[in-house]
Amino acid sequence: MGLNIGGAETHIVELSKELKKRGYDILVASNGGVYVDELVKAGIKHYNVPLNTRNVIKMYRSLRLLRKIIKEEKVDIVHSHARIPGFVTGLHHSLDFTFVTSAHWVFNTAHGLKYLTNWGQKVIAVSEDIKQYLIDNYNTPEDNIYVTINGIDTDKFSPDISGSEIIREFGLNDQAPIVSYVSRMDSDRAMVAEQLIDIAEQLDSRIAGIQFLIAGGGDVFDKLKEKADAVNGRLKRKCIVMTGARTDINKIVAVGDLFVGVSRAALEAMSAAKPVIVAGNEGYIGIFAEDKLSIAQENNFCCRGCEMSDRQKLSEDILRLISADAQTKADLGWYGREVIFKFYSVSKMADDCIKMYEDAY
């Protein structure tokens, strides 16, 4: 696992910073990435360990490096957030430490991959449906499973944040509607990004000057950038901006008149009081409002178990939001922010993890 753009990665950073504030001595080991600087600025030591690959040589190197870190730093608790770190940590049974994990998503269990997964002494799931997945697929005892949320920094993601730097950097027109989207641009994450690119020309014919600000990097970024450039060429203007990987996600969100995305990114946009269309690779919830809260919470705003996203649904909901009056959009945005304050604070996320640590220790 690395620390590039992603919901689990941001979860780790926010949790680490909150635990550090509460007096815990925090160390983070990962393959590195754009969020390392944020950890270092918070006074958190980071170790580069190749925990992002099943390559046998690199896994052996990770095994040796983790053993050295655990022994030299006298680590009491190891908290793993992905399959490979969990597997490697689980091989250190002989060392005296407490081992816990987080389940951020549902893993592929085919081809023996199930047996690479070690959930530790206790595991904390980020939604109720992932808790059930652990019980059904791994026979994890229910008493060993805790449930938490993705805690959001409501000062960092606030309606008071300005997006003016982003407007200038990318030459956007702040007098025309802007749709923001944030995700890793990987094949298993970027379906909705591609759908937005595919509907851009159709929406351009209905909404004068509409712009799409799409943030994130990954293995399909170049392919999507090529498609976006082709759309811009046909429209003879900069309709779609592909930013690549960014750490200033709060400013990307601030620029948008509305936001499209899932999971932590959707929650961050809600915290910024933006109207949000919840859509991702696993499904489609649509325009977030009070009637969507229950289903969204059940699957951690990831849309698991919902109808699939498609171009028509996206087009209709984008048109509906952009055409809505200012009060309707403001009400949707402020309702979303209220939901974050009530259910998704960083403080609650840290409290949940501390309870697990204390029970396992």
Regions found by a protein language model. Give the residues of each.
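Short His-centered aromatic/hydrophobic patch
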Residues: 80-86, 103
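Nucleotide-activated donor-binding/catalytic signature segment of Leloir-type glycosyltransferases, i.e.
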Residues: 223-246
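Conserved donor-binding/catalytic core segment of Leloir-type glycosyltransferases
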Residues: 172-193, 197-201, 213
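N-terminal strand-loop element at the rim of the active site
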Residues: 1-6, 10-12, 17-58, 217-223
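A short, well-ordered alpha-helix in the C-terminal region of glycosyltransferases
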Residues: 320, 327-343, 355
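A short helix/loop element that forms part of the nucleotide-sugar donor recognition site in Leloir-type
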Residues: 158-172
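A conserved, positively charged/aromatic
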Residues: 70, 94-128, 139, 253
